[in-house]
Swiss-Prot record:
This is Urease accessory protein UreD. It comes from Sorangium cellulosum (strain So ce56). Pfam families: UreD. The keyword Chaperone applies. Disulfide bonds: none annotated. InterPro entries: UreD.
Amino acid sequence: MRPLAPDARCAPSRPGRGPWYARRPVTTPSDPPAALREPPPPARRAGKAGSGELVFTRVAGRTVLEKALARSPLKLLAPKNHGQAAWVFVASFGGGLVGGDELNLHARVGRGAAALLSTQASTKVYRSPLVSRQRLEAEVQAGGLLVAIPDPVVCFAGSRYEQDIDVALADDASLVLVDALSSGRSARGERWAFDRYASRVRVSRGGRAVLLDATRLDPAHGALPERMGRFDALATLVALGPRAASAAEALLAPRPPPERRAELVASASPLRGGGAVVRVAGTSVERVAGFLRGALAFLAGELGDDPFARKW
């Protein structure tokens, strides 16, 4: 794990003297030997910019990963293709995003191809005064299908995170997208304790915007634990295009109103040209994951296997 930058806001100081790690130490006879003193805090580090490119192509009735390039700290894992779709898992070196890290990924899904973008585990954002960012730009050509269902983002206390997802679809291309967030490390008492979270999702079809969805959580607008109430996980699900039509239709079907103090609440809205966007809030990540897995059960047929298997 890379060392974290010291948080200057928490450093004790006296007027005119600056933070403790900037002062010259005063040696007295009672000071311990230098070898026994506590080491100084690590120097503030600038984040790293990682980038990647993926190209999926349909060849002889199945999708192949034609191109996969990654620059650290971005890491791409491509398991053996055992179905008609190609799978890629996106990760980062060090087990998460450290202050100032920025990951940019561009993906192109060719005509008639099918691709899955996922993660092996949640995306962890470590505490830092610097903002960590992720950006996904994707293009899906005619008849293609992109399934982007990463695990939830977990923002540690004091962290700052922003992400942008921009998907351009051909007129008859399809998309299944999940954007999910958990309250943090609640088992350690960190519940909605991050300093900033911002996510923007933009989807266009044939050059026309069909969805622009933004989520921003900032304690400057009010204490987050009180605003989020009993919920510990959020998700936005997008199902759009002919290859996701059955899922969109089921999601838009009338359903009874939620019970008082329900452990999961979901609300669906139609999208222009056929499709649905669903916003979900649950009392746990497992509750939200169960809803998503049921809503996206059809993906096993499109991808050759269940993308949620062996995860929860």
